[in-house]
Design a protein with these regions (language model features):
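N-terminal glycine-rich phosphate-binding loop and ensuing alpha1 helix
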Residues: 1-49
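Acidic metal-phosphate-binding loop of nucleotide-sugar-dependent transferases
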Residues: 72, 99-101
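Short aromatic/hydrophobic "clamp" motif used to bind/position activated sugar donors
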Residues: 92-94
Length: 119
């Protein structure tokens, strides 16, 4: 199983609440999730959040959301927490929450390369 995990911290230092900033009429992170879900080689996309405020803001969207600790120092730490909670995965892709225009073909290409026997 190939899983994309999107770490989404609400209170980033440089731009607090960036993930909830409206873009195309919805929170930025929603655009990121929707684009990630278009990747054909991902079996699952998980949004890893750290606050009830984010959870409430996204309640109308049908996404796979996992609440994580607020005490992580990095998105990688947040992803590691999620990985411990989920089923086994062949490939984990770290997709940044502030990449609302990510091209799903890039995700697919990365997975193809990682699945290649020559890797």
């Amino acid at each position: 199983m190939n899983i994309g995990i999107i770490p989404a911290r609400l209170n980033s230092k440089r731009f607090p609440k960036k993930i909830l900033t409206p873009l195309n009429g919805k929170p930025m992170v929603v655009n990121t999730v929707e684009r990630s879900l278009m990747a054909k080689n991902l079996d699952r996309v998980i949004l890893a959040i750290d606050s009830e405020e984010t959870k409430k803001a996204l309640k109308d969207f049908d996404f796979d959301i996992v609440m994580t600790s607020k005490n992580h120092n990095s998105g990688t730490d947040r992803i590691a927490e999620v990985v411990q909670k989920i089923e086994e995965a062949n490939i984990i892709i770290n997709i940044q929450g502030d990449e609302p225009m990510i091209d799903p073909k890039i995700i697919d290409s990365l997975i193809n390369k990682l699945e290649s026997p020559s890797v």
